[in-house]
Amino acid sequence: MSASPDYKTNLLSHLISNKVLSFGSYTLKSGRNSPYFFTTTLLHTAPLLHATASACASVLSSPPFVTTSTPDGTPRPNFDIIFGPAYKGIPLCTAVLNELGVRDTTGAWNNISYSFNRKEAKAHGEGGNIVGAPLKGKKIVIIDDVITAGTALREAVGIIEKEGGTVVGVLVLLDREERVNDNEKKSAVGCAQRDLGENVPVKAVLSLSDIIEKLGNDIGEENLKRLKEYRAQYGAEE
């Protein structure tokens, strides 16, 4: 099971046709005027969720999330659980795990599980705030839509560590590749990588560079021009 070279183009096509990714003039929480907008609240149809899960599965089934130097030559995952932080990470972790299972022809992914957290701990039944596989003693990859200020990621790491798990990787759908603020030259993904350490890969399925390079003039010359200008003005130094 290896990454499809076309998964980025395929996903971008779905995101644009379903207006998950749109172009225009948008004011972000940071106050910046962005020429594009990405919202995962629209990831709720079967074709779109499948395209998203397929792209994520392509990344997670490739290095650095798998080990290729195995005795039988079969790539094997470096993690035990895909963790989706509530709420947007929940459909992602389940859909991506399902896609990995569908693709698997070797059994290498048979023991990989999903898990997510409740915002409020359950006081009855099994109790607690974790749904899915127990995290204790397990290696965890966190999957989410984006990293903005890093607050949600830090909370997810805290939950996992409190439950006795170890974060070994992070995958997000989009890296905007822009500086967090005027005092921080790195992007949100870059900051997360710095904070978690070089041994914990933080990767994105798509980036602003992918949008520019793979779509080009298909999004219109003016939109392309504005994207390049935005990157030149706010681009991060990794």
From Swiss-Prot:
Q: Which UniProt keywords apply?
A: Glycosyltransferase, Pyrimidine biosynthesis, Transferase
Supply the InterPro entries for this chain. OPRT, Or_phspho_trans_dom, PRibTrfase_dom, PRTase-like
Record-linked Pfam families: Pribosyltran (PF00156)
What does the record give as EC number?
A: 2.4.2.10
Its EC top class is: transferase
Q: How does it assemble?
A: Homodimer.
Q: What is this protein called?
A: Orotate phosphoribosyltransferase
Q: What lineage is on file?
A: Eukaryota, Fungi, Dikarya, Ascomycota, Pezizomycotina
Q: Which gene name does the record give?
A: URA5
